Amino acid sequence: MKPVLYAHPFASYCWKVLIALYENHTAFTYRSLGPEDPEAATELEALWPLKKFPVLVDDGRPVIESSVIIEYLTLRYPGPVRLIPAEPEAALEVRFLDRYFDNYIMTPMSKIVTNQIRPEERRDPYGVEEARAALDTAYRWLDGTMRRRTWAAADDLTLADCAAAPSLFYADWAHPIGETFSHVRSYRARLLARPSVARVVDEARPFRQFFPLGAPERD
């Protein structure tokens, strides 16, 4: 039986897992969390009361958190693209950069986006200012790191790049990556040219109108 993924095409952490699945052509059943499948949300809540997604179900076992799901896929459904290196120290670098993209790019980006959704009287301009400064710092560090790299942590795409793609895609919409960070901009372009990433971007296009800050006319 194929694993089942509960996800939404526009959600950044869902992209992360979808990229991993598409990279290795892993067969799965996609339960899209939207009006076209109203039962999916009810099933998700039964599996994970926090109602966070994505959630993967395999042989009746729920696997939760995007990084853990990708680790699980590498164990149960390995493919030609090794998303976690076999060599332990190389794997540590991949896991570190996975956390870097989630914690230091995705998190401040999410603060900027979430602030826009709030009622105007409850918005937090200072928090947004802090988030923008944090993103500039994160871009600067990453620019130096990517100076001599094609992919985040290895010679080919890994878990780290699965995290990087949605992080940098949406972060550039929320707080544009400046021209001074040319290596980050080039890396983002390479990610968007990768077939698995291009696929998730295309699948999300119908939902761009819902981006709280307004989706730019690009990408």
Q: Where do the model's predicted regions map?
A:
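GST-like fold's C-terminal all-alpha helical module
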Residues: 101-195, 200
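Residue-level detector of family-conserved "landmark" positions at structurally sensitive sites
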Residues: 31, 66, 156, 201-202
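GST-like domain detector, emphasizing the conserved glutathione-binding G-site
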Residues: 1-129
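Positions that flank functional sites
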Residues: 35-36, 157, 206-207
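Acidic/histidine-enriched, glycine/proline-rich intrinsically disordered or flexible terminal extensions
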Residues: 203-219
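Short, charged/polar low-complexity linear motifs in solvent-exposed/disordered segments
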Residues: 46, 82-83, 115, 178, ...
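Residue-level recognition of oxygen-bearing side chains
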Residues: 68, 89, 183, 196, ...
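Compositionally biased, low-structure terminal segments
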Residues: 29, 182, 211-212
